[in-house]
Amino acid sequence: MKHGSLIGLVSGIAVSMLGSAAIAEDAPFRPEPGKFPPLEKAHVYRGELVFVDHANRRGSIRVQGEGTYFRNPPQPFAMLPYGMVRYHAAPADLRDLPLGTVLHVRGYLPPDPKTSVVPVLPVNAKDKDHGYLGKGITPAENHLLLLEDEPSHCLREGKIWKLKEVNITNNAGTIVASRESKQGQTEKADEETLTLDGATCIWRGRESLLVEDLIAEGIWPNSGKKSLEGQAVQLGITWKPNAEFTQFHISDIWLDDTAMQFAVRKQTETHKAFIRSRWMPARVDAVEYGKFGHATVTTTLFGGMDDSLYTDFKKNVPALMNGAENTLKHTAGVHGPAHMASRGSILDVIKTDEDVPLGNSGIQVRFKTDLIIEGIRPGRVVRVRPDSWPKVKLPREEYLEPLFGIPQKRFPTPYIFPKY
C-alpha cells in the first residue's frame, strides 16, 4: 500500500466520522436493509474482544461501562455485511484480532431481527442499571459498522498517547499516560494508569524490543519511577486480570512513525492476501435479465479495502460472482465458491466523485454472465473475483453447501456430526 493511499484512506474515514460521536442521537437506530446507514446514527462504545467466530463475522465483547469492568459478561456482536474491521491502522478481518484486544465500536440495532446471527436485545438495553456493573454494558446496537483497535482509532481521529511516568519493578509495572490530540487541546486530558509487563512489545523503527531492553539502555529505570515528559507514542491496549476493578494493559508501544507504518504495511499485506482468496464483497444494485440465463448485474463494492484491490477491477476482465450471506459466507457449491459461481466479464467500472457513507466504496461494477445463479438478486450480498486473483480452495467452514443455503439452516445442525 502506498503511503499516499494510506493517508487518503485514514483521512477519508476521519472526515466522514468527524464529530459523529458527539452528534449521535439518543434514539437507537435500525439500518434499512439494502442501504448504507448514516454514521452519525451509530452508538459508540468500547471493550475487550472475548470471543470470535471469524467464519460468520461475529463474536463477543466485554463492554466497558460505568461499573466494575471485570464482572461484565461478554456481549455478542455481528459485523454488518459492509462493516469494517481495522487493526494496526489497516484493513483487517476478525481472525486478525488477538483475543483481549480493546476495541472501539460503532454499532446499530439489527437491520432485520428475524435474521440476526446474534441474540436480539431490547432496544433500550444499554440504559439498564446493573448495580455494581453500572449502565451501558449491554448495548442492543450489536450490528457493527466499524470495529477498530486503539492505534487505528487514534490515527483516524488524529490523536496520540503522551507518556507521563513509568514505574518499574522486575520488568513490569505501570505507565501514566493520556490520549490527546496531535494538534494540542485547551482542556487537560484525563490521565490513565496502564499496566505493562515483560511481554509488552516496544517498537522502535524496525526493531522489536522488550521492557528489559529499555532498562538495559538506561532509558527506563531498573526499579522505581521515572518521568517520561509527555513522550508521544501510539499504544496497543488489551485487558488482563489484576487486582484493580477497571485497569487496562499495554500490549504494544510504537515509539515513532517508522515503527507504526511498518505495522500498517504488514497488516495491509495480510488483508490483501485474505480478500484476494475470499473475493471482494459487494451489494447487488440491479439485475437486467436476458434470455436463457443471460443477465447483466450492477453491484456496489463494499468499502474499507486497500486501494490496490479496487484497481484490479477493470473493464473487459473475466470474473466470477457468487452469492453470499450477510455474514459474507459464500453460498452454494459443494466443492467451494467457484463450483456454482456465475462466470462472465466486467462490462464497466463506475467511480463516483460524491461523498459516500462508510462501508460504501463509491465503486460500481457491471458484470455480464450467460448463466446467472439464484443468489444474485437486487439487495443481496455477493462476492466477486477478477480473473487476476488466485484460485484457491477455501476451508469447509467458509462456505455453505446447498443443504445449508436457507436462512433457517445457516447455523450448524446435528447433520455435521458423523453417524456411529
Regions found by a protein language model. Give the residues of each.
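Positively charged n-region of N-terminal signal peptides that target proteins for export
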Residues: M1-L6
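Bacterial N-terminal signal peptides
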Residues: G8-L18
